[in-house]
Amino acid sequence: MHFYQNVLKFPLTELIKNRDYPGSSHFFFDINNSNLLAFFDFPGLDLGPYAEVLGGLHHLAISVSRDKWAALRANLDAAGVEYMEESGTSLYFRDPDGARLELLADPLGEMYGNQVL
């Protein structure tokens, strides 16, 4: 939770008890543009590190304004996060659990200056 709240500055909007697994929580972060990112914690359940698999999730792209992108890049730098790939509008990196994320500063509906929608 620290990484998403304090490094990426995504507000925690809801924290509820997971009724399917005792002692577990279900929590949601506001990632902009009316989107939420949800996670479960499973204390005591050793699932091992995150692993990319064929057909699985490649990465989660999160669109932010250019100003917010620059501020988040500074936060990532200060936290010592290594980039897998970067350009003037896109950063690929991993969260502390190994999930691949992308921060994208292109306006919604554009990619690298081209209209996509």
What are these language model-derived features?
Residues 1-36:
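Core segments of cupin and vicinal oxygen chelate
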Residues 54-100, 107-108:
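Vicinal oxygen chelate
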